[in-house]
Amino acid sequence: MAAAAGDADDEPRSGHSSSEGECAVAPEPLTDAEGLFSFADFGSALGGGGAGLSGRASGGAQSPLRYLHVLWQQDAEPRDELRCKIPAGRLRRAARPHRRLGPTGKEVHALKRLRDSANANDVETVQQLLEDGADPCAADDKGRTALHFASCNGNDQIVQLLLDHGADPNQRDGLGNTPLHLAACTNHVPVITTLLRGGARVDALDRAGRTPLHLAKSKLNILQEGHAQCLEAVRLEVKQIIHMLREYLERLGQHEQRERLDDLCTRLQMTSTKEQVDEVTDLLASFTSLSLQMQSMEKR
């Protein structure tokens, strides 16, 4: 019998037998030649101090507790064997539904500083926080991101910094406004141009459905009313409007219209008097009105 047990040790067996109340021993085969271990044998072993098992365990080297350990392990599937060795508290923690951890207090403070710095036009702090890994898309309780604040303030440099670090130009705040909407409401033409280049949607500028063409027309009407401004200020504003419209029409695929704007921009650069600038302004206003009419016809 001992020899048979030794043979069983050489070839481990697993699984259940067909005999009632008997099963194969795993993971260490301490069985007879049939590969079976009887619960009756185990009971008699406990009652007789282990004598009933000595002959079936390689000459009595194993104690009844060793067989108890084997019985405890044998019905466990492989994944359960590891579980038996893990403390109960750790198992309970592992069984809890996985919850995504939010930002730490330090990170929350950094994100708030990013928004505050963008709102305060603090370019250096914004750049440092972005380089330190602050998320440019993080919003406050009203859904406003640093890009919303910078766009509303008209700070083109901060807007470009945020876009370069992954800010979403189409992210909406709690009221549904995108950064492009806010830049348009505050008449910040250069910011609109930067946002358009950064991937802002061009299908509608704000909740009222106004486009950069509407904004350009309004701005040009103000310039045509003749408010007292120096020549350079008027030229700069007209140039900004041309750049915005050129980017907008390029996004719409209207390349021929963009070429006309390029011609106007060249003429603007050659102006030296206010009358010449006014002439370019009038041409640009006519171009804008015509483009709006064409858009209205296309929608019909």
Swiss-Prot record:
Annotated motif Nuclear export signal (NES): location in the chain?
A: 283-293
- GO terms for molecular function, please? protein kinase regulator activity; protein-containing complex binding
Instruction: Give the modified residues of type Phosphoserine.
Output: S58, S63
**Alphabetical UniProt keywords:** Acetylation, ANK repeat, Cytoplasm, Nucleus, Phosphoprotein, Repeat
Q: Where is this region: LYN-binding?
A: 141-241
Query: Which parts are the ANK repeats?
Result: 109-138, 142-171, 175-204, 208-244
The protein in question is named: Ankyrin repeat domain-containing protein 54
Q: Which organism is it from?
A: Homo sapiens (Human)
GN (gene name)? ANKRD54
